[in-house]
Amino acid sequence: MPYLDAAGDMRDIFAEYIHAKTLWIDTEVADYQSRQPRLSLIQVLDDPTDMSGDRVYILDVLQYPNIVAEFIQQIMCNSQIEKVFHNANFDLKFLGGKKAQNVTCTLELAKSIPYYLLPLPNYQLKTLATALCRFNYIDKQEQGSDWGRRPLTETQIEYAYLDCIYLAQVHLQLLELQVASNPDPKKEDLTALDARYQDLLTDWQLLKSEFEHLEERLKKAMQAQNVKETSVCKLTSYERQTVKVPFSELVNLVQNDNLSLDFPVTLTQKLQKDLGASWQKLPVEIEKNTYLRLSQKKNDAIQE
């Protein structure tokens, strides 16, 4: 885990990184709860097979805003290099924002995996690393430590480099899950899909029915007992207001006040019926959309 705090050394490693295909990156921020947070460290791993930390470079950029700018220009804005983060939106606040190109976020990647393949209570890096990679006893206590202090403690440095290792391993596992959850439709085994669909259908109908019934019972019970929260649920209420006006009155208002009001109106089946054949005199624009609906075939066999 090389720790670099000299501008020249950091520029040397940038020269290596511009040839990388993928970089796994994390950051540590000083004064992150203040109005002026400062980027303290940039941790970079260029070899996902490294579990020792030898290829995790810790760049101490606290006093080098110019080095951060160079990193953004040479690495973050380089579309040829994939940059992998967890919760990339946070890191990009300090590393180029919208200028950054070819960024992968493992948080968003995890969210895209169907829940049944990744049934986790949350998608924090610690949770993912434990569930997918069997990294146990991950200590995130140092995350909220003082990253503006110098020198950093050994515990802080260990925490910083380990996060890159967790990130890379989680990324690789998520890529495998992504492939598993998106098979080629042309090669799918329809017989196997049919069988699994049938297996789940009855259980799903029962579960859905019970769940919806429980929701209604909970709402009624909480209202009747004047309870706003239970250990699991929270009851909230809201009002929805709809403003309606007769169409003729709207037309009169537009004409009388000489308003410039022009927008398309969807001619529903009811409106078409009310207008009769007259609607065909209008300069309509017809949009056609195709939707697919999956339904269970009815059993035509006579049951006695």
What residue spans do the PLM features occupy?
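Extended, charge-rich alpha-helical segments
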Residues: 205-304
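A broadly conserved detector of short glycine/acidic/proline-rich loop/turn motifs that flank catalytic sites
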Residues: 29, 63, 171, 239-241, ...
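Residue-level signal for secondary-structure boundary elements
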Residues: 22-25, 118-121, 137-141, 172, ...
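Residues that form generic nucleotide/phosphate-binding pockets
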Residues: 13-16, 74-75, 128-132, 196, ...
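N-terminal accessory regions of nucleic-acid-interacting proteins
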Residues: 1-27, 302-304
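Exposed alpha-helical structural elements
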Residues: 9-13, 67-71, 124-128, 155, ...
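Mixed-charge, glycine-rich, non-catalytic linkers/tails in nucleic-acid processing enzymes
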Residues: 154-215
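Conserved DEDDh/DEDDy metal-dependent 3′-5′ exonuclease domain
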Residues: 2-5, 18-23, 32-166
